[in-house]
């Protein structure tokens, strides 16, 4: 089993401030930044990078996050001022803001001749489910991914983070 986790509160809060994002955009980009940082850190090349791009057809537009192999990450969202209603009290509707009619594209630049590019159709626009789908479909690695951003009442980031857990080749059912 390969597992990686991140506490990304500081990264996501800094992005919120820099891009002057409203809560729904903060939650969406924060999830993508967390995923990119973990995936960048999982690479086997020290000077490589990974780019995650989501074009979901939702009002946020394109979301992009780029990470190096140390997990240093940056990103943007086309429309940071989008504010959507909550799914229910306390739960932002990130899936509706991102949209589910589009693609997640992952570009792994391992400093070889050509970068590896993999794309999958979005499952939900909630980002963690889409990352899971990417690993299962494009890399054939059974994966569990969870990503979260908790927005405080003053619109700052109270907490952000996530995890990726993957079964490695040869893993038995007992390990699961």
PLM features: residue spans?
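Interaction interfaces in information-processing and related assembly proteins
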Residues: 1-176
